[in-house]
Amino acid sequence: LRPLHPLPGAVLDYRLVAKLKSTYVDTLPDMVHPETGRLHASFNQTVAATGRLSSSDPNLQNIPIRTPLGREVRRAFVPGARGTTRRRRAFVPGEKGWVLLSADYSQIELRIMAHLSKDPALVEAFARGIDVHRDTASRLFGIPPEAVSEPQRAQAKTVNFGVLYGQGPYGLARTLGIPTGEAATFIRAYKETYAGVVAYLDRTLEEARRAGFVTTLLNRRRYIPAIRSKSAAARAAAERLAINTPIQGSAADLIKVAMVELDRRLRAGRFRGRLLLQVHDELVLECPADEVERLAALVRDAMEGALELDVPMVVNIGVGANWAEIH
């Protein structure tokens, strides 16, 4: 209704501001530790069934980033020197001479899919360092990569992840806002292009039905008893879990191995910088400005070399005075 009248837009804007205010602006300052001047979250190893870390009290993996107002909340997160003990309220400038450093895996789930499926087209795309979503769009629309428009690339990205996680024509049509028949055509073209991915997904489901569980790269198991359920709805949900878990669980394996190796190297190198947060596929550190270059190289090497895969891992580095600036 937003395009039809200003009132619905105003209501939605108010809800966004009210949510940001109640969840973050009014709440987080009261959670700052009185002695350290910092927020101290808990990271939970055994909450998410995929093996990913979750965060609580407060949840620092859920700080908004997708809207301009949400990014203003991230601007409040600033670095502080190790050992800072002065009392400091939230939402004030950080320690002078210190910065935040973000290290974010690029397309980690698609890269893991390429490794697990051994699909030639996907493996080649990552090996050549090309834009996988643009390459998919080129194949789906039958046009040269340089002719792919941004809307076409965005559609291809949605198809890449939709098919990866078992989305059918109806769900993809709703996501893209296109007719179901067109979505079915996209899915059919994707399956023809990436036959190795489809074969891997079929093998994964077959093995899950046989064994009752699926495994990650490091052989962690997730049991999925509902995959043998007599209920079609329960079975369909279990099949989605069987497809999701090896990908998301392997991503969790990868970043945890990287974190352990990074911690070892930080201690061995006597860096003043340190790891602060893990936010899904991203690590956030703080360090003195004069350590940035060395630390960025160390972090990238530890993350990209955490596990040996058939495709290269790529880590994007960002540096800034606050959490908003590093993206």
What name fits each language-model region?
Residues 1-327:
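Conserved catalytic core of nucleotide polymerization and phosphodiester-bond processing enzymes
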